[in-house]
């Protein structure tokens, strides 16, 4: 396919046009007084949003070179969202500010590579300063404040996220679902829960809750199908003599084995329940091993040379209580050793760092949560705009996790203004690198300027006043008041601010050092002309039909 090329300043101008157009749309949503953006939908009513990344995802341009610039900034927003869960608008505004100032310097004849080196040096200094300024986010009040700010000042969301994190801990999994009531609800699942229920309803012993409840059960873990009762006779006899109940977790239990277990359960010989093992393939094996460590048992598997016929009570795990419903199994207070569980968590975390798949990382995080803390489910109030609200809660959840991970700094753009001090006295190796440092110095004022502008105030006046002040003194755009941002509950996760700055500077530097752009030439569609009808030959033989 034929290509179209752009070089030098022409290429950068086209990119800059795309960056400006996308940033103009996204920046309108920034801050507590951010404006709404209306997005057209193919079907139904348009969507109204204040979420910067949602706006960015919708934007594409017909001009391919302009579109490349926009897509690169869109990548900044997406990467920041993936890493820190928030800060997409901040990253977009910062990237635009660096690109605009940098483009002026390149147009004036400065060396793009030296500008990049100066910007990188300044980013490293500002990042270090942010980490020095960061304070740990430990108490529920700070977590609630971070969640509230990220959820566009919705205090109900901030409070319920803080409550959820308090109950399941920072390692716990918190999920968001649509509720059926008129109030937000928080449901906490204690212990390890997986999405497999009883194989047969004849295992139910609590008719009111339609569940099988086992107190102090032995837990048999088998990595294969169980079809014949002969394989597990020795285990059943041992449990019948010394244990009150038995939970069997296997790939499947069927045929004669299932029928015998049901009969034994109904006659009261052995209180038993059988469930299928969670997951599939290698993930099933890993989750069975998790359960084994949690309950101080072992997985009966031919791969490691153990068989069901030779299993003894020592092979079985134990727990304080197990509740099995039609859809879920919950193991409460497994008897596993804390040291073994912590070692398993460390091992899974190492796998999380190595994997490149977001899906795999999410599943590994769920396994950590089930071993370490628990699972909390936030059920949202039934409202017409619940999809928009659900996205807002998920953003706030990511922000609070980031705050717990790396701490918090003063919000509202104040932390970046304070971090400017790290650039005082910082020098590059030449004048062009010094210009790169100054470009970043001016660019990190842009988030505060945009927040103030969206609130309807004069940015220059407020930025100067905040810059001349100390510590956490800043401007509350929601109320129009000056004061201590931390005391006013306006906080940003350090990770969000740091990630937004680093990603913005990285992509902006790429743009400034771009010398050529290559795009496909659009295909010219041929006009659909009327084809020749041709003759009606071959009709002469129809005379014989007379």
Curated annotation (Swiss-Prot):
EC number from the UniProt entry: 5.6.1.7
Species of the source: Legionella micdadei
UniProt keywords, alphabetically: ATP-binding, Chaperone, Cytoplasm, Isomerase, Nucleotide-binding
Known role: Together with its co-chaperonin GroES, plays an essential role in assisting protein folding. The GroEL-GroES system forms a nano-cage that allows encapsulation of the non-native substrate proteins and provides a physical environment optimized to promote and accelerate protein folding.
Pfam families, alphabetized: Cpn60_TCP1 (PF00118)
Signals that turn on the gene: Not induced by heat shock.
Chief site of localization: cytoplasm
Annotated localization: Cytoplasm
Enzyme class: isomerase
Annotated GO MF terms: ATP binding; ATP-dependent protein folding chaperone; isomerase activity; unfolded protein binding
Any one GO CC term of the record: cytoplasm
Highest taxon of the lineage: Bacteria
Annotated protein name in UniProt: Chaperonin GroEL
The keyword Ribonucleoprotein appears for this protein: no
InterPro entries: Chaperonin_Cpn60_CS, Cpn60/GroEL, Cpn60/GroEL/TCP-1, GroEL-like_apical_dom_sf, GROEL-like_equatorial_sf, TCP-1-like_intermed_sf
Subunit description: Forms a cylinder of 14 subunits composed of two heptameric rings stacked back-to-back. Interacts with the co-chaperonin GroES.
Residue sites binding ATP per the record: 29-32, 50, 86-90, 412, 476-478, 492
Catalysed conversion reaction: ATP + H2O + a folded polypeptide = ADP + phosphate + an unfolded polypeptide
Family: Belongs to the chaperonin (HSP60) family.
